[in-house]
């Protein structure tokens, strides 16, 4: 039987989580898929390209598209990310507006909703109140009412915690009901359509972002140079990658005193890389300065933006 053979009434489609930076979109994507496919960090604007996570159910296949958060851009990179996001919205079967339970709805949320309605005026909307584990029941109730009022019409609103799993299955049931009937788009063993190098570079970037403050996180980009069998150790893969920053001072911060921070980056990234490659890994990281790459069209193209 082909993976495209589906029972009568089977539903499938693409849903995008939309919201301000740091509303928990990537964490929720991982929770629904059941495996880590999107990196997470305490800094806003971590996601840099649409990541498709695939949820398999007996009655549906849900493709969750985790996009960069819509924001008012300060760099050419920011402008390009916003364009990617808007193009993604136009192709969705369902768009979910996400707001955290522990932060009041404000002008930023309204700006995002207006942007979504301009790009995808006919696409159904779903409201999701995230991070309910961080708020009281009364706070969650107020947020649900305010989000319902913001969306207007007959849009449904669902509370969820990606951390505890509370309401996860309820949310999947609601999403399934709102998707159209259709075929499977991916085989049952696929959880994402990201290529291996992209997943590895994102894991390294996540490890590099840990503990960073101010503007430095936005200046970090990662590129995989090559993945090769180790010449001397059987069953070991050598992963060679470059971390790019914009200034020499940023390079010094990432290397750390006596190379300690760089060592932590390697230590933290290796376990997830080993999971993906299914092999022991020697991770070789170099840090290079690529001056003002966020504003340079040529360098943005080289880095895949």
UniProtKB/Swiss-Prot annotation:
UniProt cross-references to Gene3D superfamilies, sorted A to Z: 3.30.300.20, P-loop containing nucleotide triphosphate hydrolases
Pfam families xref list: KH_2, MMR_HSR1
Main subcellular location of this protein, as a coarse class: cytoplasm
Domain Era-type G, chain residue ranges per copy: 11-181
Stretches for region G1: 19-26
Disulfide bonds: none
Domain KH type-2 stretches: 212-291
Region feature G5, mapped onto this chain: 160-162
Domain of life (superkingdom): Bacteria
Residues covered by region (G2): 45-49
Topological category with respect to the lipid bilayer: Peripheral membrane protein
Matching SUPFAM superfamilies: P-loop containing nucleoside triphosphate hydrolases, Prokaryotic type KH domain (KH-domain type II)
Region called G4, residue ranges: 130-133
One example GO MF annotation: GTPase activity
One GO BP annotation of this record: ribosomal small subunit assembly
Keywords: Cell membrane, Cytoplasm, GTP-binding, Membrane, Nucleotide-binding, Ribosome biogenesis, RNA-binding, rRNA-binding
Annotated stretches, region: G3: 66-69
GO cellular component: cytosol; plasma membrane
Positions contributing to GTP binding: 19-26, 66-70, 130-133
Cross-referenced CDD domains: Era, KH-II_Era
Role noted for this protein: An essential GTPase that binds both GDP and GTP, with rapid nucleotide exchange. Plays a role in 16S rRNA processing and 30S ribosomal subunit biogenesis and possibly also in cell cycle regulation and energy metabolism.
Protein family membership: Belongs to the TRAFAC class TrmE-Era-EngA-EngB-Septin-like GTPase superfamily. Era GTPase family.
NCBIfam families, sorted: era, PRK00089.1, small_GTP
Subunit annotation: Monomer.
UniProt cross-references to PANTHER family, sorted A to Z: GTPASE ERA, GTPASE ERA, MITOCHONDRIAL
Protein's UniProt name: GTPase Era
Species in which this protein is naturally found: Corynebacterium diphtheriae (strain ATCC 700971 / NCTC 13129 / Biotype gravis)
């Amino acid at each position: 039987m082909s993976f495209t053979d589906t029972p009568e009434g089977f539903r499938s489609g693409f849903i995008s989580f939309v919201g301000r930076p740091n509303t928990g979109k990537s964490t929720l994507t991982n929770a629904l898929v059941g495996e880590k496919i999107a990196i997470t960090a305490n800094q806003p604007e971590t996601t840099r390209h649409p990541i498709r996570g695939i949820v398999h159910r007996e009655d549906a296949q849900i493709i969750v598209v985790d996009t960069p958060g819509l924001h008012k851009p300060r760099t050419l990179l920011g402008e390009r990310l916003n364009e990617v996001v808007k193009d993604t919205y136009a192709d969705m079967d369902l768009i979910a507006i996400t707001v955290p339970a522990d932060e009041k709805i404000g002008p930023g949320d309204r700006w995002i909703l207006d942007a979504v309605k301009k790009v995808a005026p006919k696409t159904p909307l779903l409201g999701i109140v995230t991070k309910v584990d961080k708020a009281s029941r009364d706070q969650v109730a107020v947020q649900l009412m305010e989000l319902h009022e913001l969306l207007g019409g007959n849009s449904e609103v669902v509370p969820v915690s990606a951390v505890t799993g509370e309401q996860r299955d309820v949310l999947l049931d609601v999403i399934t009901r709102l998707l159209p009937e259709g075929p499977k788009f991916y085989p049952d063993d696929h959880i994402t359509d990201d290529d291996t190098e992209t997943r590895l570079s994102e894991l390294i970037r996540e490890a590099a972002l840990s503990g960073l403050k101010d503007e430095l996180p936005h200046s970090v980009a990662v590129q995989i140079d090559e993945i090769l069998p180790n010449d001397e150790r059987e069953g070991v893969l050598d992963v060679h990658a470059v971390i790019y920053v914009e200034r020499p001072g940023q390079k010094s911060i990432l290397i750390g005193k006596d190379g300690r921070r760089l060592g932590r980056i390697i230590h933290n990234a290796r376990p997830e890389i080993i999971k993906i490659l299914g092999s022991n890994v020697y991770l070789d990281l170099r840090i290079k300065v690529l001056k003002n790459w966020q504003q340079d069209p040529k360098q943005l193209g080289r880095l895949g933006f």
